[in-house]
């Protein structure tokens, strides 16, 4: 009887983890991985400038936080609390790194990802 109850509890726990999905945590903030993935499409990719016929010079990247927080209505609601933080730029850069390769987060290669 106890084994049956334990089995049911384990299955319910596993189901709860699967339903909740992967969570990305940065400090005291946590976000669903699906919201973090949306960052990838929000930021326009800067095209490199042609310096000579063989070399490209990268442009200086514009700060991410002011652009996303003030003018981008497509910023997922779950990520909006980042805009209120004084280090929003650093947080968004870390989240963008995860957004560039979310598969790595889905297998929990990042320490910031939980719920695998």
UniProtKB/Swiss-Prot annotation:
Residues in coiled coil: none
GO molecular function annotations of the record: guanylate cyclase activator activity
InterPro entries membership: Guanylin, Guanylin_sf
Signal peptide: 1-23
Protein name per UniProt: Guanylin
Cellular localization per UniProt: Secreted
Species of origin: Mus musculus (Mouse)
Top-level division of the source organism's lineage: Eukaryota
Protein task: Endogenous activator of intestinal guanylate cyclase. It stimulates this enzyme through the same receptor binding region as the heat-stable enterotoxins.
Gene: Guca2a
Gene Ontology CC annotation, any one: extracellular region
